[in-house]
């Protein structure tokens, strides 16, 4: 309980909010993203991350090794040069065979351990074109504040070191999650983070 949720519809609504949150970060920023390709949207994101790192904020970016192939090497170098800690999840390798199919599809932005943005977006011009604040693809993100942010932070902290071994962290299986009451009071939202992957989804099915 004690959480606040705000549904943000489409890139023109959620990307400016996400960039503003990065710009206002005081201590730390964590970004976990699948799709990141060259364009104005990615440029805006990279610039905000670099600016945060240059003013002393700890910035960690975990990008999927396949989904981020479209990010130019010059922008990767820009991130590293500014002091951003950059890791790739499961970079492609010809010896890895079917293990190349293991991808990190999480889309998560955490700011100062107090604010989370989670949803389905990628950082491409299809989701947001900054020049005219337009979009081609429909997508949603949810802005979250409150105790639930700590659960998202925990997922990132688990996946961050696991990425070095090209592994996905998995919690212990459970027998299902308690059902949540409908329509909590505004500003007193109830929520739960349920982790799942292709082989571990029983908690969500039983919640």
Where are the regions that the model predicts?
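Charged, low-complexity intrinsically disordered terminal segments
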Residues: 1-207
């Amino acid at each position: 309980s004690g959480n606040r949720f705000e549904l943000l519809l489409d890139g023109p609504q959620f990307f400016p909010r996400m960039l503003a949150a990065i710009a206002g970060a005081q201590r730390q920023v964590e970004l976990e993203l699948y799709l990141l390709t060259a364009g104005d949207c990615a440029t805006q994101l990279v610039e905000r991350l670099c600016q945060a790192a240059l003013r002393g904020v700890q910035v960690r970016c975990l990008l999927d090794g396949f989904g981020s192939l479209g990010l130019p090497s010059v922008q990767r170098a820009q991130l590293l040069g500014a002091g951003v800690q950059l890791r790739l999840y499961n970079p492609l390798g010809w010896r890895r065979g079917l293990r190349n199919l293991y991808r990190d599809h999480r889309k998560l932005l955490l700011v100062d351990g107090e604010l989370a943005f989670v949803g389905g977006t990628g950082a491409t011009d299809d989701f947001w074109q900054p020049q005219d604040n337009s979009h081609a693809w429909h997508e949603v993100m949810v802005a979250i504040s409150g105790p639930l942010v700590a659960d998202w932070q925990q997922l990132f902290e688990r996946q961050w070191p696991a990425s070095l071994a090209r592994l996905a962290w998995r919690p212990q299986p459970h027998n299902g999650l308690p059902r949540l009451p409908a329509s909590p009071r505004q500003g007193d939202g109830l929520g739960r983070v349920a982790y799942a992957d292709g082989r571990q989804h029983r908690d969500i099915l039983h919640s």
